[in-house]
Amino acid sequence: MIGGGIDLTREDGRMFNELRPVKITTDFVKFAEGSCLIQCGDTMVLCCASVEEKTPPHVPYGEGWITAEYSMLPRANRERSRRDVAKLKLSPRSAEIQRLVGRSLRSAVDMKRLGERTITIDCDVLQGDGGTRTASVTGVSAGIVEDAPLLDLRYSEDSRAQVDLNCVMNELGELIEIQGTGEGRAFSPAEQQELVRLCAKGCKELLSIQKEALGGKF
């Protein structure tokens, strides 16, 4: 039964509604206008921001733009994967994730206050153990594994998930992005609500970690 009374200890010792240890290291690289390394358990993503004093043609006069690129290092996973550039095309997964990151960030920024400039966020996965797309934008995943709802799936859980859901939320707890998929079975509206509730808890905790990492700058 899905509900708040579940007492489930997972293979890594976490409770069903517990995030993996999260660490955000700011100014991780020297030359980018902004950067951070985010670690969610064994998942590590390097995010770098680059600023250009111009915007794409479709952007309204006086406004800015935020876009993103996403990739995984060949040995970010247990087996080597080919770089997208070696395949001469962007993988559908990478394209989907970088659109997710761009959309999410644009929803959080006042484009008029940004001015006529473009910020490009490069998200490079150094090591992947589940949740690389949500780590790239400080969102969180939840899923149903063996009919139990779990927050923040690592790879060994994600690979067995019957239902997988990714959420990005703002400071008010409002949804910016939600992606839910039945991997092994269908899921009910009540189950979806429970997974969103778990994600809301996780996003609230991640927001506090972000603010602490920024040292009160924002």
Language-model features, listed with the residues they occupy:
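Compositionally biased, non-globular sequence tracts
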Residues: 7-10, 14, 85-86, 146, ...
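A short glycine/serine-rich beta->alpha loop
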Residues: 86-90, 123-132
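Generic beta-strand or strand-like secondary-structure segments
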Residues: 96, 100-104, 120, 139, ...
